[in-house]
Amino acid sequence: MAIGKRIILFILTNLLVLLLVGIVFRMVGFSGYYTATGGLDLTALLVFSGIFGFAGSFISLLLSKFIAKRAMRVQIIDTPRNPTEEWILSATHRLADQAGVGKPEVGIFDGEPNAFATGWNRNNALVAVSTGLIQRMNKDEVEAVLAHEIAHVANGDMVTLALIQGVVNTFVIFMARIVGHFVDRVLLKNERGHGLGYWVSVIVAEIVFGLLASIVVMWFSRLREYRADAGAAELTSKGAMIGALRALGQSKEPDMPEQVAAFGINAKGGLMALLRSHPPIADRIRALGG
């Protein structure tokens, strides 16, 4: 997905989250708890921010397999229909055994060369590869890609990212409401409840803080890719992993849902590189000693 589309989707998602949080806060009277004295009860606000911040993150994690299957139209390999599917299924399960994790669901989806892993725990994951990847890579390279995804599962990357996202969500909700309260009370001199200025300020602050916080999340995401590459090299071979990365680098960037740990192509640099979930292919190859 183009970076511009990702940012637009991110902003729209935050606006919807803000609307939902605001409605729930009003319905159950939460805002009355953290503004009961006319000022802000920071402890109460932090508690409620944490509840909503982590709830959203873990609900997304629990639904990740469901969302990924439908978003990518994944065909689960229950009974292999041909030798290729049989090999992919057996190779994935063999790599899972090597890594000490439960056998994941295995699937195939249409598209440019890519693969992803998702799921809420190490023993209930989904690993899927694209038809483009199967067609353009040799067996050693495909196996290295499968090993990369199994490494994500073994490292618990999805759960760790959910925890980090929960912390980030808490920070964004908490800080945005502090900014909104300051604007409403200090700048606009509104002494009765929270007016329009508060909600507008919260929306703007959530967008700004959300983008800044995403830089931290994406930085960690890039680190996990290096670790998964190294794990794949151990499960297969360094040469196979480097070969897979080089083959992937010749493909165009695929469109992947945000809920998955994708093998990933991110070639663009500059400031936008801070919002990329994957390091450049060349950097990943260098990290493997290639």
Name these PLM-found stretches.
Residues 150-169, 241:
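Catalytic Zn2+-binding segment of zinc metalloproteases
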Residues 98-124, 189-193, 202, 209, ...:
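Active-site-proximal gating segments in proteases and membrane effectors
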